[in-house]
Design a protein with these regions (language model features):
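Ferredoxin-type iron-sulfur electron-transfer modules and their immediate structural context
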Residues: 2-380, 428-482, 513-532, 537-540
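N-terminal Rossmann-like FAD-binding beta1-loop-alpha1 element of flavoenzymes
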Residues: 380-409
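Short amphipathic alpha-helical segments
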Residues: 398-400, 422, 523-527
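Glycine-rich FAD pyrophosphate-binding loop
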Residues: 406-426, 432
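Residue-level detector of anion-binding/catalytic polar loops
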Residues: 407-408, 487, 509
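A conserved beta-strand/loop element that lines the FAD pocket in flavoprotein oxidoreductases
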Residues: 477-497
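Core beta-strand elements of the Rossmann-like FAD/NAD(P) dinucleotide-binding domain
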Residues: 498, 502-510
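Predominantly flavin-linked oxidoreductase catalytic cores and closely associated redox partners
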Residues: 548-550
């Protein structure tokens, strides 16, 4: 394994030590001053009075800083070449999204009826285009669409000289976007998909079938995702899909309209409600979503992750398949919303996929120059907090308490399996020892059908099916377990093994109850508690805790 050789005279241990992080922050500030003196002065002014910026000023500053954070991290970890290669992949895909918006949506399909599009000779047009763009027979759709977009972008530079090929391209785009055969051919692509209007009462596409005299609704068969065993069934969007969504976003923080983050408001300031009565409050963390989308669309994945980590440092436990309050409050209320969770998760995965990617993400949860209010962990306070429950609430609270300088002991009723001491820094007996940097995140990944139930994560461990990659729980666990101010104990029941009086007798200054709601959401339908009828939460808990999943 290649050893980690950090720049600026820092060691790996410095990244987990407050004094080392202070030196790191000074190195970044000097790096910024050398590269952009005016931006450096803006950062220093903002750190002195972060609330004086206002929302718009803070957004502009973070977006401007993000590329510099990315360059600094690439140099710090010695992966500048890999970071530039990741940026290049983003830039190579850029024509897809500009051509989709400016040519396909605004020209090719405008005013064209579906019947007229279906009458076009799509296969014949495709053969002509294959010759013009140099596509080979059987070429994969993402690559074909990229070739098409690159050529159309070049042809648009001189529309007069390229009128004939642009007309051909426009007719093909209309066929591919509007006709049933075209939509089927490009079902796995992004270029010829336009946002659809939303019918809130028919959000899931279904078809009507009749079987044995009974009329029923079902998902169209070509949308079925077959599950065999307990392997991961949803790997999420790839880079093409995530950037498609990031470019679909109109980056409305520029107008102060980023309702995905701040919620949709009525004129009186109250939050709007959906047709189902759901409050459209946006992201509970007020994550800077629009800013993330803009920076990601510009090709800066590390910079985008740094923006996410300001408000949502434990983003490994959010995103795709976990939460969608942001989507519900998206400014697009009458058409498909931006798939924000996909963008967030893809951004994290792109960083984790770099050499030392886990260490970069981990570092941003402790030191984040874009966090104007707490760029560094605060000095130790000597205060001790007992966190009851290691589900999403417990582990997120524990993280923030540690960064505020407190000591945290966390307990959970589930048995928590130990991790190897060389990656966790904790031996089986609970003693601390040095741990190794992780170069390749694959070292932390297990197949979900082979994965041992680790016990960490609460409801995220036992209540979520294999549509979500539970390897993220190991990543979250390591963010905490490697911290010297944190200890956790499984198989401890609050109120039994330890009581509130016992906790204070042990010297804890505060007890935080993060044990969950305790009761399931009961669906209000007749006979819902009849024998043989199980609530989803009850079924999943029994499935996971009895080992039936294995």
């Amino acid at each position: 394994m290649t050893d980690l050789a950090l720049k600026y005279g820092l060691s790996f241990a410095d990244l987990y030590d407050r004094d080392g992080l202070v030196r790191l922050d000074r190195a970044f500030v000097a790096h910024l001053a050398e590269g952009d003196a005016a931006l450096h002065e803006r950062l220093m002014t903002a750190r002195r009075d972060p609330d004086g910026l206002g929302h718009a000023g803070e957004s502009d500053l973070l977006v401007d800083l993000a590329p510099h954070v990315e360059d600094f991290l690439g140099h710090l970890f010695g992966i500048a070449v890999e970071v530039r290669a990741l940026q290049a992949r983003h830039h190579e895909l850029a024509p897809l999204y500009s051509v989709k918006r400016l040519f396909v949506q605004r020209r090719a399909v405008k005013g064209v009826k579906e019947a007229d599009a279906a009458a076009l000779d799509g296969p014949g047009l495709a053969r002509e285009l294959d010759r013009l763009i140099g596509a080979s027979p059987g070429e994969r759709m993402p690559e074909w669409e990229r070739r098409y977009a690159e050529h159309v972008a070049r042809w648009l530079d001189d529309e007069t000289a390229n009128a004939a090929v642009l007309d051909l391209s426009q007719r093909y785009a209309a066929w591919a976007t509007l006709s049933p055969d075209g939509r089927e051919k490009h079902r796995r692509g992004v270029l010829f998909k336009v946002p659809q209007r939303l019918d809130p009462h028919h959000l899931v596409p279904v078809e009507t079938i009749e079987r044995e005299g009974v009329t029923m609704l079902r998902l169209p068969e070509d949308e079925w995702r077959h599950r065999e065993g307990f392997a991961l069934t949803d790997h999420g969007a790839d880079l093409i899909g995530a950037l498609d969504q990031a470019n679909y976003c109109i980056w409305c923080h520029n107008q102060g309209k980023d309702s995905c983050s701040k919620g949709l408001k009525e004129k009186d300031g109250a939050f709007k409600r959906s047709v189902f009565g759901v409050t459209l409050a946006g992201c509970p963390l007020e994550e800077k979503i629009s800013e993330m989308n803009l920076v990601k669309a510009r090709g800066y994945s590390l910079g985008a992750l740094a923006i996410v980590a300001v408000d949502n440092p434990i983003c490994a436990a959010t995103g795709h398949r976990i939460c969608n309050d942001c989507m519900k409050a998206c400014i697009y209320q009458r058409q498909e919303p931006v798939d924000i969770p996909q963008i967030e998760t893809r951004t994290l995965k792109d960083v984790l996929g770099l050499p030392w990617g886990f260490e970069i993400y981990s570092l941003l949860t402790r030191w984040n120059p874009l966090d104007l209010r707490r760029p560094l962990p605060r000095p130790q306070t000597g205060k001790k907090v007992l966190v009851v429950g290691l589900g999403p609430a417990g582990f997120t609270l524990a993280h923030h308490l540690i960064n505020d300088g407190h000591f945290v002991a966390a307990i959970d009723g589930l048995k928590i399996e130990p991790l190897p001491a060389e990656i966790s820094g904790v031996a089986v007996d609970g003693s601390r020892q040095p741990f190794q940097p992780i170069r390749d995140v694959a070292r932390l990944v297990d197949g979900l059908d082979d994965r041992v139930m680790a016990g960490f994560g609460g409801v995220a461990e036992y209540g979520i099916t294999v549509r979500w990659d539970k390897n993220f729980l190991k990543i979250v666990r390591l963010l905490l377990e490697r911290r010297g101010q944190f200890a956790m104990y499984g198989g401890v029941r609050f109120g039994g093994t330890i009581t509130i009086d016992g906790a204070f007798a042990l010297g804890f200054d505060h007890v935080a109850l993060c044990a969950g709601a305790g009761r399931p959401t009961v669906i209000p339908i007749a006979n819902n508690l009849a024998p043989g009828v199980r609530q989803a939460s009850d079924f999943l808990m029994a499935l996971q805790l009895t080992g039936a999943a294995k």
